[in-house]
């Protein structure tokens, strides 16, 4: 199909190239052979009068013209999908759909494991691709490259719908051999002790507890930074360091790692875990189905009684 001399199939190829940044992967994404994808690039270059991509090693580097075209092309394809091509109804028992979800290691352990278990029973052909926290998850959401974000609602965009999962408390924790934790600790002691903290993505963005503490004006002495919450409990063992962690994560690790929760001198710290999905997928039957499962399972999580 052509529109003003442009084969619209070439826009699908351009979108795949911008997403994958590798020729073979882009060709595989839209079920083309590598020679056919190379031919599509040549035709795109002719139509737009621009090189569009250069090769650096095996990676395709887009030109400014390609970067400028990419958002409009992706939005146009998404609107065609939603406005012209109807969403397929979902039969969970027979579906082979794959959902891509960005979430933290903490949420995989304490929440998403129960989703995997339930879906395995109700929709055995459905699969998941669980992705680490990205430097720009909202761009992935806008492009429809992920089905859900699952993380604290304070980090979520106002441009897409979202729903609350549950509230989470943050607690102060350390190794039971740490003599400074035998009783209540003062604010000065808390601030002077070495802390272990998680940061995420290539830009090392702060985790929710660090964000909340900075919002209160508390700048801790962080001695060890790791790329995820689940690494922290083991790294506290045998040291005098402390961490401020989600309570459910501490309860999970208490079964295998000696940990001590201490009364914090800080005001109680809480955050809300939530889900967010692309606005353009709001009426997608598959998205609605999984959304309902996520909310149902969240409602079954025991409320917390402990606080910092």
Swiss-Prot record:
Sum up the protein's function in the record's words.
NodD regulates the expression of the nodABCFE genes which encode other nodulation proteins. NodD is also a negative regulator of its own expression. Binds flavonoids as inducers.
Gene3D superfamilies hit by this protein: Periplasmic binding protein-like II, Winged helix-like DNA-binding domain superfamily/Winged helix DNA-binding domain
Name the source organism: Rhizobium meliloti (strain 1021) (Ensifer meliloti)
GO terms for molecular function, please? DNA-binding transcription activator activity; transcription cis-regulatory region binding
GO CC terms for this protein? protein-DNA complex
Q: Which residues bind DNA?
A: 23-42
Q: Which superkingdom does the taxonomy of this entry point to?
A: Bacteria
Q: Which family does it belong to?
A: Belongs to the LysR transcriptional regulatory family.
Miscellaneous comment in the UniProt entry for this protein: There are at least three nodD genes in R.meliloti. They differ in their specificity of interaction with different flavonoids and, consequently, contribute to the nodulation of various plant host species to different extents.
Q: Where is the HTH lysR-type domain?
A: 6-63
Q: Which UniProt keywords apply?
A: Activator, DNA-binding, Nodulation, Plasmid, Repressor, Transcription, Transcription regulation
Q: Does the keyword DNA-binding apply?
A: yes
Entries under PROSITE patterns matching the protein: HTH_LYSR (PS50931)
Kindly give the InterPro entries that the UniProt entry links to this protein.
LysR-type_TF, LysR_subst-bd, NodD_PBP2, Tscrpt_reg_HTH_LysR, WH-like_DNA-bd_sf, WH_DNA-bd_sf
What's the name of the protein? Nodulation protein D 1
Annotated gene: nodD1
């Amino acid at each position: 199909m052509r529109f003003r001399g442009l084969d619209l199939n070439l826009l699908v190829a351009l979108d795949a190239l911008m997403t994958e940044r590798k020729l073979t992967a882009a060709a595989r994404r839209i079920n083309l052979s590598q020679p056919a994808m190379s031919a599509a690039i040549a035709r795109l270059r002719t139509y737009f009068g621009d090189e569009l991509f250069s090769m650096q090693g095996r990676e395709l580097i887009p030109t400014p013209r390609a970067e400028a075209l990419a958002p409009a092309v992706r939005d146009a394809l998404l609107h065609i999908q939603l406005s012209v091509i109807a969403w397929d109804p979902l039969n969970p028992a027979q579906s082979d759909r794959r959902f891509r979800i960005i979430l933290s290691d903490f949420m995989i352990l304490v929440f998403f494991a129960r989703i995997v278990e339930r879906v395995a029973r109700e929709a055995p052909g459905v699969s998941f691709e669980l992705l680490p926290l990205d430097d720009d998850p909202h761009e992935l959401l806008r492009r429809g490259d992920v089905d859900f974000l699952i993380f604290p609602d304070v980090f979520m965009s106002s441009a897409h719908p979202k729903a609350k999962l549950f509230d989470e408390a943050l607690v102060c924790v350390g190794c039971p051999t740490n003599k400074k934790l035998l009783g209540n600790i003062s604010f000065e002691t808390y601030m002077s002790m070495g802390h272990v903290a998680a940061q995420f993505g290539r830009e090392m963005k702060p985790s929710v507890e660090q964000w909340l503490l900075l919002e209160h004006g508390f700048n801790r002495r962080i001695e060890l930074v790791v790329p995820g919450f689940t690494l922290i409990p083991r790294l506290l063992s045998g040291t005098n360091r402390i961490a401020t962690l989600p309570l459910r994560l501490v309860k999970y690790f208490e079964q295998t790692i000696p940990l001590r929760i201490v009364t914090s001198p800080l005001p109680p710290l809480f955050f809300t875990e939530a889900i967010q999905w692309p606005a353009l997928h709001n009426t997608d039957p598959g998205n609605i189905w999984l959304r309902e499962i996520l909310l149902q399972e969240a409602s079954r999580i025991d409320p917390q009684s402990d606080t910092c």
